């Protein structure tokens, strides 16, 4: 009975350890001299960041087609209803829809093929806020987009050179106005 109990505890701890090491944290910081309302799909919703504020977002392993973008010129009431000049997602603070163009996008899929995360920046939907996406572990590529048509970002859908990979379990830092 003791062996069975020990094995159950071992596999439980192993499962928890694997799950936590494969999830990712995105620390989203606003360095812009104006307020940015970052939004995140499929988890996270959205919130307001004034200059210098950071929002930490935990994203589960296995998340695919994740997106983070900045909204500008927003005005929300106490119930979270309102609108944004750029990146609006159906007139709500907590986004459940993608942002309306123009939006500079950080895109990601976590713990995919060969235990890798895949990430990119995209200005296919237009450019609205300067952005930098950097993995926190060494050896992975930092992407920066300071203006429309920036060289680190997708400019058209079939550009196979803009997606980058990093080992699963990596955390990321996204900075508006780096």
What do these predicted ranges mean?
Residues 2-178:
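Extracellular low-complexity, O-glycosylation-prone Ser/Thr/Pro/Gly-rich "stalks"
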């Amino acid at each position: 009975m003791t062996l069975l109990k020990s094995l159950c505890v071992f596999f439980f701890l192993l499962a928890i350890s694997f799950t936590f090491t494969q999830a990712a944290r995105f620390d989203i910081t606003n360095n812009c001299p104006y307020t940015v309302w970052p939004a995140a799909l499929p988890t996270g919703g959205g919130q307001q960041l004034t200059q210098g504020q950071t929002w930490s977002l935990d994203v589960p392993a296995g998340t695919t087609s994740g997106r983070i973008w900045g909204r500008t010129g927003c005005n929300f009431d106490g119930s979270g209803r309102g609108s944004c000049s750029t990146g609006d997602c159906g007139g709500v603070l907590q986004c459940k829809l993608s942002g309306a163009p123009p939006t500079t996008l950080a895109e990601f899929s976590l713990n995919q093929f060969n235990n890798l995360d895949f990430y990119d920046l995209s200005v296919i939907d237009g450019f609205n806020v300067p952005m930098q996406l950097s993995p926190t572990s060494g050896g992975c590529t930092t992407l920066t987009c300071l203006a429309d048509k920036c060289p680190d970002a997708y400019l058209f859908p079939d550009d196979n050179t803009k997606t980058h990979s990093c080992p699963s379990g990596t955390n990321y830092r996204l900075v508006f106005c780096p």
